[in-house]
A protein has these predicted regions:
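Metallo-beta-lactamase
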Residues: 38, 107, 115, 149-208, ...
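Active-site environment of divalent metal-dependent phosphoester hydrolases
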Residues: 32, 53-55, 124-131, 154, ...
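Bacterial N-terminal signal peptides
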Residues: 13-25
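Conserved beta-strand hairpin/beta-sheet module of binuclear metal-dependent hydrolase folds
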Residues: 33-108, 218-234
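N-terminal secretory signal peptides that target proteins for export/translocation
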Residues: 1-10
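Active-site metal-binding motif and surrounding structural segment of the metallo-beta-lactamase
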Residues: 100-146
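Active-site neighborhood of phospho(di)ester-bond hydrolases with catalytic His/Asp-centered motifs
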Residues: 93-97, 118-125, 146-148, 208-211, ...
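Cap/insert and terminal regions of metallo-dependent hydrolase folds
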Residues: 222-308
Length: 308
Protein backbone atom coordinates (compact mmCIF):
# COMPACT_ATOMS: atom_id res chain seq x y z
CA UNK A 1 0.00 0.00 0.00
CA UNK A 2 1.38 3.39 -0.93
CA UNK A 3 1.40 5.92 1.93
CA UNK A 4 -0.90 8.72 0.81
CA UNK A 5 -1.02 12.32 1.95
CA UNK A 6 0.38 11.85 5.46
CA UNK A 7 2.79 9.54 7.23
CA UNK A 8 3.29 10.34 10.88
CA UNK A 9 3.34 8.57 14.23
CA UNK A 10 0.18 9.50 16.10
CA UNK A 11 2.18 10.58 19.12
CA UNK A 12 5.07 12.31 17.33
CA UNK A 13 3.42 15.03 15.30
CA UNK A 14 5.18 18.17 16.51
CA UNK A 15 3.04 21.28 16.51
CA UNK A 16 0.47 19.69 14.25
CA UNK A 17 -2.51 18.89 16.44
CA UNK A 18 -5.60 20.91 15.77
CA UNK A 19 -7.43 21.05 19.10
CA UNK A 20 -11.12 20.76 18.50
CA UNK A 21 -13.54 20.65 21.40
CA UNK A 22 -16.76 19.55 19.79
CA UNK A 23 -18.83 21.94 21.88
CA UNK A 24 -17.79 24.52 19.30
CA UNK A 25 -18.03 22.29 16.23
CA UNK A 26 -18.71 24.14 12.99
CA UNK A 27 -20.06 22.91 9.68
CA UNK A 28 -17.41 20.97 7.82
CA UNK A 29 -15.83 22.03 4.54
CA UNK A 30 -15.44 19.50 1.75
CA UNK A 31 -12.73 16.99 2.64
CA UNK A 32 -10.65 14.35 0.95
CA UNK A 33 -11.71 10.75 1.25
CA UNK A 34 -8.35 9.25 2.19
CA UNK A 35 -5.45 10.12 4.47
CA UNK A 36 -2.73 7.94 6.01
CA UNK A 37 -1.14 7.99 9.46
CA UNK A 38 1.50 5.76 11.00
CA UNK A 39 1.16 3.66 14.15
CA UNK A 40 4.55 2.10 14.74
CA UNK A 41 5.33 0.23 11.54
CA UNK A 42 1.63 0.04 10.59
CA UNK A 43 0.16 2.42 8.04
CA UNK A 44 -3.46 3.35 8.84
CA UNK A 45 -5.53 4.90 6.05
CA UNK A 46 -8.94 6.50 6.39
CA UNK A 47 -11.40 5.45 3.69
CA UNK A 48 -14.26 7.92 4.00
CA UNK A 49 -17.50 7.81 2.07
CA UNK A 50 -18.31 11.38 2.98
CA UNK A 51 -19.00 13.93 5.67
CA UNK A 52 -22.46 14.94 6.85
CA UNK A 53 -24.39 16.56 9.65
CA UNK A 54 -26.40 14.49 12.13
CA UNK A 55 -29.56 15.64 13.90
CA UNK A 56 -30.86 15.47 17.45
CA UNK A 57 -33.82 13.26 16.49
CA UNK A 58 -31.69 10.10 16.91
CA UNK A 59 -30.31 11.02 20.33
CA UNK A 60 -31.51 9.13 23.41
CA UNK A 61 -31.13 10.64 26.88
CA UNK A 62 -29.96 14.05 25.69
CA UNK A 63 -31.59 16.83 27.72
CA UNK A 64 -32.31 20.28 26.34
CA UNK A 65 -29.49 21.58 28.54
CA UNK A 66 -27.02 19.07 27.10
CA UNK A 67 -28.01 19.93 23.55
CA UNK A 68 -27.79 23.66 24.20
CA UNK A 69 -24.32 23.27 25.67
CA UNK A 70 -22.83 20.73 23.25
CA UNK A 71 -24.60 21.33 19.93
CA UNK A 72 -26.45 24.66 20.13
CA UNK A 73 -27.05 24.67 16.38
CA UNK A 74 -28.93 21.38 16.70
CA UNK A 75 -26.62 19.26 14.56
CA UNK A 76 -23.17 17.70 14.72
CA UNK A 77 -20.43 16.50 12.34
CA UNK A 78 -20.51 12.87 11.30
CA UNK A 79 -19.10 10.62 8.59
CA UNK A 80 -19.05 7.09 7.21
CA UNK A 81 -15.57 5.60 7.49
CA UNK A 82 -13.64 2.38 6.99
CA UNK A 83 -9.91 1.94 7.61
CA UNK A 84 -7.20 0.20 5.62
CA UNK A 85 -4.13 -1.04 7.49
CA UNK A 86 -0.81 -2.16 6.06
CA UNK A 87 0.66 -4.41 8.75
CA UNK A 88 3.95 -5.86 7.59
CA UNK A 89 3.16 -7.97 4.54
CA UNK A 90 -0.57 -8.01 5.30
CA UNK A 91 -3.26 -5.68 3.98
CA UNK A 92 -6.18 -5.47 6.40
CA UNK A 93 -9.54 -3.74 6.06
CA UNK A 94 -11.54 -2.68 9.11
CA UNK A 95 -15.21 -2.39 8.19
CA UNK A 96 -16.34 -2.31 4.59
CA UNK A 97 -18.45 0.82 4.23
CA UNK A 98 -21.68 1.26 2.34
CA UNK A 99 -20.57 -0.14 -1.00
CA UNK A 100 -18.24 0.24 -3.95
CA UNK A 101 -16.94 3.62 -2.72
CA UNK A 102 -14.78 1.79 -0.18
CA UNK A 103 -13.02 -0.07 -2.98
CA UNK A 104 -12.66 3.15 -5.00
CA UNK A 105 -10.97 4.79 -2.02
CA UNK A 106 -8.60 1.82 -1.71
CA UNK A 107 -7.71 2.10 -5.37
CA UNK A 108 -6.85 5.77 -4.80
CA UNK A 109 -4.20 4.43 -2.42
CA UNK A 110 -2.93 1.99 -5.02
CA UNK A 111 -4.51 -1.05 -3.38
CA UNK A 112 -6.71 -3.54 -5.21
CA UNK A 113 -9.54 -5.38 -3.50
CA UNK A 114 -7.88 -8.66 -4.43
CA UNK A 115 -4.84 -7.65 -2.35
CA UNK A 116 -6.78 -7.46 0.92
CA UNK A 117 -5.83 -10.39 3.17
CA UNK A 118 -8.45 -9.92 5.90
CA UNK A 119 -11.59 -7.89 6.57
CA UNK A 120 -12.50 -7.24 10.22
CA UNK A 121 -16.11 -6.24 10.84
CA UNK A 122 -17.05 -4.31 13.98
CA UNK A 123 -20.71 -5.23 13.42
CA UNK A 124 -23.00 -6.17 10.58
CA UNK A 125 -24.97 -2.98 9.94
CA UNK A 126 -25.26 -1.99 6.29
CA UNK A 127 -22.79 0.90 6.45
CA UNK A 128 -20.07 -1.51 7.62
CA UNK A 129 -20.57 -4.44 5.25
CA UNK A 130 -21.62 -2.79 1.99
CA UNK A 131 -18.61 -3.73 -0.14
CA UNK A 132 -18.33 -7.33 1.05
CA UNK A 133 -20.75 -8.57 -1.60
CA UNK A 134 -21.16 -6.63 -4.85
CA UNK A 135 -23.53 -7.85 -7.56
CA UNK A 136 -23.49 -11.27 -5.95
CA UNK A 137 -19.69 -11.60 -5.95
CA UNK A 138 -17.25 -11.24 -3.08
CA UNK A 139 -15.83 -7.74 -2.97
CA UNK A 140 -12.60 -9.07 -1.48
CA UNK A 141 -12.08 -12.44 -3.16
CA UNK A 142 -8.91 -13.43 -1.29
CA UNK A 143 -9.77 -12.12 2.16
CA UNK A 144 -10.66 -13.91 5.36
CA UNK A 145 -13.73 -12.33 6.96
CA UNK A 146 -13.58 -11.82 10.74
CA UNK A 147 -16.84 -11.46 12.69
CA UNK A 148 -17.53 -11.82 16.41
CA UNK A 149 -19.41 -14.90 17.58
CA UNK A 150 -22.23 -12.94 19.29
CA UNK A 151 -22.79 -10.96 16.08
CA UNK A 152 -22.69 -14.08 13.92
CA UNK A 153 -25.05 -15.94 16.24
CA UNK A 154 -27.54 -13.08 16.23
CA UNK A 155 -27.78 -12.91 12.44
CA UNK A 156 -27.90 -16.68 12.05
CA UNK A 157 -30.61 -17.13 14.69
CA UNK A 158 -33.90 -18.47 13.33
CA UNK A 159 -35.55 -17.15 16.49
CA UNK A 160 -34.37 -13.63 15.73
CA UNK A 161 -35.57 -13.93 12.14
CA UNK A 162 -38.98 -15.24 13.20
CA UNK A 163 -39.41 -12.39 15.67
CA UNK A 164 -38.98 -9.69 13.04
CA UNK A 165 -41.79 -8.28 10.91
CA UNK A 166 -41.67 -9.37 7.28
CA UNK A 167 -40.42 -5.99 6.08
CA UNK A 168 -37.34 -6.17 8.32
CA UNK A 169 -36.18 -9.67 7.50
CA UNK A 170 -34.34 -8.62 4.36
CA UNK A 171 -31.47 -7.17 6.38
CA UNK A 172 -30.90 -10.47 8.15
CA UNK A 173 -31.01 -12.31 4.83
CA UNK A 174 -28.46 -9.93 3.30
CA UNK A 175 -26.02 -10.54 6.14
CA UNK A 176 -26.53 -14.29 5.90
CA UNK A 177 -25.74 -14.10 2.19
CA UNK A 178 -22.43 -12.42 3.03
CA UNK A 179 -21.55 -15.04 5.62
CA UNK A 180 -22.37 -17.75 3.11
CA UNK A 181 -20.24 -16.15 0.39
CA UNK A 182 -17.23 -16.11 2.73
CA UNK A 183 -17.98 -19.44 4.43
CA UNK A 184 -14.70 -21.01 3.30
CA UNK A 185 -12.72 -18.11 4.80
CA UNK A 186 -14.85 -17.06 7.75
CA UNK A 187 -13.20 -16.54 11.14
CA UNK A 188 -15.73 -16.38 13.98
CA UNK A 189 -13.97 -15.09 17.08
CA UNK A 190 -14.79 -14.39 20.71
CA UNK A 191 -13.65 -10.90 21.79
CA UNK A 192 -12.41 -10.02 25.27
CA UNK A 193 -12.04 -7.08 27.60
CA UNK A 194 -9.63 -4.44 26.36
CA UNK A 195 -7.15 -5.14 29.16
CA UNK A 196 -6.47 -8.66 27.86
CA UNK A 197 -8.21 -8.89 24.49
CA UNK A 198 -7.36 -11.94 22.36
CA UNK A 199 -4.99 -11.46 19.43
CA UNK A 200 -6.49 -12.40 16.05
CA UNK A 201 -3.41 -11.54 13.99
CA UNK A 202 -0.08 -10.07 15.13
CA UNK A 203 -0.88 -6.60 16.43
CA UNK A 204 -4.68 -6.94 16.11
CA UNK A 205 -6.78 -7.63 19.23
CA UNK A 206 -10.56 -8.04 19.43
CA UNK A 207 -12.28 -5.95 22.13
CA UNK A 208 -15.85 -6.51 23.32
CA UNK A 209 -17.88 -3.30 22.91
CA UNK A 210 -21.41 -4.68 23.06
CA UNK A 211 -24.58 -2.63 23.06
CA UNK A 212 -24.82 -0.94 19.69
CA UNK A 213 -25.40 -4.46 18.40
CA UNK A 214 -25.29 -7.77 20.29
CA UNK A 215 -21.79 -8.52 19.03
CA UNK A 216 -20.32 -5.08 18.37
CA UNK A 217 -16.53 -5.02 18.82
CA UNK A 218 -13.54 -2.74 18.50
CA UNK A 219 -10.02 -3.61 17.40
CA UNK A 220 -6.91 -2.60 19.31
CA UNK A 221 -3.90 -2.24 17.01
CA UNK A 222 -0.33 -2.25 18.32
CA UNK A 223 3.00 -1.94 16.53
CA UNK A 224 6.42 -1.08 17.94
CA UNK A 225 4.88 0.17 21.19
CA UNK A 226 2.33 2.46 19.51
CA UNK A 227 -1.40 1.75 19.69
CA UNK A 228 -4.65 2.76 18.01
CA UNK A 229 -8.15 1.69 19.03
CA UNK A 230 -10.57 1.31 16.13
CA UNK A 231 -13.87 1.55 17.95
CA UNK A 232 -16.47 1.20 15.19
CA UNK A 233 -19.81 2.61 16.35
CA UNK A 234 -18.94 3.13 20.00
CA UNK A 235 -19.99 6.72 19.25
CA UNK A 236 -22.15 8.32 16.57
CA UNK A 237 -22.39 11.93 17.74
CA UNK A 238 -18.97 12.90 19.07
CA UNK A 239 -20.03 16.48 19.72
CA UNK A 240 -22.41 15.43 22.48
CA UNK A 241 -21.29 11.91 23.39
CA UNK A 242 -17.80 13.07 24.40
CA UNK A 243 -18.93 15.64 26.98
CA UNK A 244 -21.93 13.41 27.82
CA UNK A 245 -21.09 9.70 27.30
CA UNK A 246 -24.46 8.75 28.79
CA UNK A 247 -26.19 9.96 25.60
CA UNK A 248 -27.12 7.08 23.30
CA UNK A 249 -28.68 6.82 19.84
CA UNK A 250 -31.97 5.28 18.80
CA UNK A 251 -30.33 2.55 16.74
CA UNK A 252 -28.40 1.04 19.66
CA UNK A 253 -29.89 -2.41 20.20
CA UNK A 254 -29.28 -2.26 23.97
CA UNK A 255 -29.09 1.31 25.23
CA UNK A 256 -27.84 0.52 28.72
CA UNK A 257 -25.15 -1.84 27.46
CA UNK A 258 -24.01 0.64 24.80
CA UNK A 259 -23.59 3.35 27.44
CA UNK A 260 -21.73 0.95 29.74
CA UNK A 261 -19.32 -0.07 26.97
CA UNK A 262 -18.76 3.53 25.91
CA UNK A 263 -18.00 4.77 29.42
CA UNK A 264 -15.58 1.94 30.14
CA UNK A 265 -13.69 2.17 26.86
CA UNK A 266 -13.51 5.97 26.84
CA UNK A 267 -11.95 5.85 30.29
CA UNK A 268 -9.47 3.16 29.29
CA UNK A 269 -8.19 4.85 26.13
CA UNK A 270 -8.02 8.22 27.88
CA UNK A 271 -6.18 6.85 30.93
CA UNK A 272 -3.76 4.96 28.69
CA UNK A 273 -3.37 7.74 26.11
CA UNK A 274 -4.38 5.50 23.22
CA UNK A 275 -5.44 7.31 20.03
CA UNK A 276 -8.74 6.25 18.54
CA UNK A 277 -10.45 5.97 15.16
CA UNK A 278 -14.17 5.67 14.55
CA UNK A 279 -16.62 4.85 11.81
CA UNK A 280 -18.59 8.06 12.34
CA UNK A 281 -15.89 10.53 13.35
CA UNK A 282 -15.48 13.48 11.02
CA UNK A 283 -12.43 13.76 8.77
CA UNK A 284 -9.75 12.57 9.31
CA UNK A 285 -11.60 10.03 11.46
CA UNK A 286 -8.92 9.70 14.14
CA UNK A 287 -7.81 11.55 17.26
CA UNK A 288 -7.28 11.33 21.00
CA UNK A 289 -9.21 12.04 24.18
CA UNK A 290 -8.52 14.13 27.25
CA UNK A 291 -10.63 14.23 30.41
CA UNK A 292 -12.42 17.51 31.02
CA UNK A 293 -13.49 19.14 34.28
CA UNK A 294 -17.11 18.03 33.88
CA UNK A 295 -16.54 14.26 33.98
CA UNK A 296 -16.72 14.07 30.21
CA UNK A 297 -14.10 14.19 27.49
CA UNK A 298 -12.68 16.56 24.93
CA UNK A 299 -11.63 15.17 21.55
CA UNK A 300 -8.63 16.25 19.50
CA UNK A 301 -8.68 15.46 15.80
CA UNK A 302 -5.49 14.27 14.18
CA UNK A 303 -3.93 16.97 12.03
CA UNK A 304 -3.46 16.77 8.28
CA UNK A 305 -0.76 19.45 8.37
CA UNK A 306 1.82 17.14 6.79
CA UNK A 307 -0.46 16.26 3.89
CA UNK A 308 1.15 16.32 0.47
Amino acid sequence: MKPYLLKSNLWNIVGCYVLLVFVFAQSLPAQNNVITFGVGSFQISLLSEGQRQGGTNVLVGATDEMIKKAIPEGNYPSATNAFLVEAGNKVLLFDAGLGAKTIENMEALGVKASEVDAVFITHAHGDHIGSLLLNGAKGFPNATLYISKPEYDYYMSDEVMAGLPENRRGGITSVRNIFNAYKDKLNIFTPGEIENAPELLPGVRAVAAYGHTPGHVGFLLESDGSKLFLWGDLTHAMAIQMPFPEVAVSYDSDTAKAIESRKKLLKYVCDNKIPIAGAHIQYPGMGRLTKNASNGYDFTLMCECEAR
